[in-house]
Amino acid sequence: MTSDAAPELLLSIESTCDETAAAVIRRDGTVLGQCIATQETLHEQFGGVVPEIAARAHLERILPVINTALKQADVCGEDLTAIAVADRPGLAGSLLVGVVAAKTLALAWSKPLIALNHLHAHLYACQLIDGAPENIYPAIGLIVSGGHTSLYVCHTAIELEYLGGTIDDAAGEAFDKVAAMLSLPFPGGVEVAKLASEGNDKAYSFPRSMIHDPGDDFSFSGLKTAVRYAIAGPGRQDFSTLEISDQVKRDVCASFEAAVVDVLVSKCRRAIKRHKNRNKSNANEANRLIVGGGVAANQRLRRDLQAAADQDGFELWIAPPHLCTDNAVMGAIAWKKFEAEQFASLDLDITPGLQRGF
């Protein structure tokens, strides 16, 4: 007997930083429509995201992006089951645009509202990989992005235990700042990785800060300073007139990237081993690493994590590159909150910032 019931549909909205995105997602995970408006050209001349410019761009683009996703899915607001939006963490102005839009549509269409943690959604993107187990949890989770570098125990998709994070710069932020020192185009992380693939990763002996620290915190500011000293000496602030050979750029990028990846891999291995020791009765379940965030697209990181997984015998699931950067498809995590009846009120406020513990 077949059912004529209409499919359950979720509208997911993302505006935490400089991408305006929306997606229409069925309960089974099928993406019926999605749209992303990027802002790279708006921020390129500044070498980084300018919060006010980002917020204004979101304001201009949010409704066209939502309408495009709905049109692709061939649905209207009344067809939706729920509306989800990332309300934390991120840039205040950017978050506000998405949250206000979601609350307005939820009110207008009489749909339940679901608030999402942007970082938890990044990790959930691993669940969307073809071949991933139906339930990828529990696992150790690594978020590595421009604003955050954090480790978690992920008991379920929506129950995460924060283990530790960066005490200064995030890994992605360090990539962007090194790119700026070398006068590379924005966004810098991709450019650094490109040059790194052609360089000698042993040309410079950069520090691996906190790599031997038994805790789960990270630090990349010292590495950033070491790169500055290597290419310009102490005290220099203006790098625009500094002449650096192409080979030096390649070697600096390769040595820098190796230092970042070594720390990330080492911390993940240690966290997994500790988690396994705490859960010896369920060792197989505790023996899994999931990775999300923009820097998770880095090929050296993916390669070295896979090598560690093969050597240590743990499962590795990394979000596909197109879901590492900010997007609304990872908002499919909202279905887990829907099932748990974790709905937000129309008084929902934003929680911006880069605070530890998210």
Give the residues covered by each predicted segment.
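Conserved phosphate-binding catalytic cores of ATP/NTP-utilizing and phosphoryl-transfer enzymes
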Residues: T2-E8, L116-I140, A334
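A short helix-loop
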Residues: T2-L9, S15-T16, A23, G33-Q34, ...
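N-terminal beta-alpha supersecondary unit
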Residues: A6-D79, V85-P89, H118, H122
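Glycine-rich phosphate-binding loop and adjoining helix at the ATP-binding site
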Residues: D79-G131
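Glycine-rich beta-strand-to-loop/alpha-helix junction loops that act as flexible
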Residues: V85-R88, L105, S145, L289-N298
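Conserved phosphate-binding/catalytic loops in two-lobed NTP-binding clefts
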Residues: A115-L116, R288, L305-G331
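Glycine-rich phosphate-binding/hydrolytic loop that grips phosphoryl groups
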Residues: H122-Y124, A319-G357
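A contiguous, well-structured pocket-lining segment that forms one wall/lid of small-molecule binding clefts
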Residues: K194-L289, N298-D312, Q342, F358
